[in-house]
Amino acid sequence: LTIYWDNKYVAPEHAFDTTRKSELVADLIVETHEETGIALAAPKIEFLGKAESLIETLLDPKYVEALRTGVPISLASSNGFEWDEGIWDMAVHSTAGVINAIYETEKRPFGSVNGSLSSGLHHADNKRGMGFCTVNGLAVGAYYAHTEGHAKKKVLIIDFDAHCGGGTMSFITSLGMDWVDQLDLSTNGFDSYVAAGNHELVIHRGDERSYLQEVWSLLDAVEWDDYDLVLYNAGIDPHPRISVNGLAQRDELVFNRIFQETLPCVFVLAGGYTSSYGTIEEVADTHFNTVLASERILDLIRPFASSKSL
């Protein structure tokens, strides 16, 4: 299991959970490497260049210029942060981590999981940021996967953040990305959208037990044969209504089902704020649970892949 991250993920001067927590998760990966075998890697130079090119191609030129220069400030700070030069670096490196993970994951034919400690993605569309999100690495990653031949059928974006992924829906709709479907389970109606076709949005108001039942039902209803890549936006902000243990069970359900379907998966971080967890360390620990859940699935994949290669 390889998780992508470098210190440019935390380049912005603006200190907020979204711009700082990935470093703590990265520290946990390094500290536990000998025990878990999970590797931390920086996005490769070729993917940094590819990410910058994709951002320049897919995003509105006015928004790209604003992210680079801070002008106009209303657009440059549309993500909710004060602009500084680190915003652009963060956007490029965070996006590069997603596409690097997609590239590496697709190379394994019997289902596999990799991740990027990218966060602040799904409220941004291709014209502006919103809700602490700057560049939508989910949508950019899906575009990269399809156009580079890593997903020859369709890409499924599973978004289990507390809030709706309206930015993702706007992005893929405005660019006519009909090879992307979105499965969105939220606990809060912020950034909601009208789901049509193969897209689905469920806003769940119940308790933890019914939430996990909803996760299982939604995963069971997916036409998995339609897809050859899954991108998982692993939000931890359904907490505190959903406990830390409940979120871990949810991640196990997601990764187990993807394993059963022998599909490649790339996950990113989402949600998770000190306002509901108490400390940034608790936020990082909960995100790390997602990393550990993905590693447990790889323990199941390894013997399966080995037997298939005999």
Language-model features, listed with the residues they occupy:
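N-terminal low-complexity, Ser/Thr- and acidic-residue-enriched intrinsically disordered segments
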Residues: 1-54
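A general "terminal functional-core" signal
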Residues: 3, 71-310
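Short, flexible active-site-adjacent loop segments at beta-strand->alpha-helix junctions, enriched
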Residues: 9, 61, 120-121
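Alpha-helical structural motif
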Residues: 21, 51-54, 59, 94, ...
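Short helix-loop boundary/capping segments at the starts of domains
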Residues: 31-38, 57-64, 107
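Charged, often glycine-rich, active-site loop that binds/positions anionic groups
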Residues: 48-73
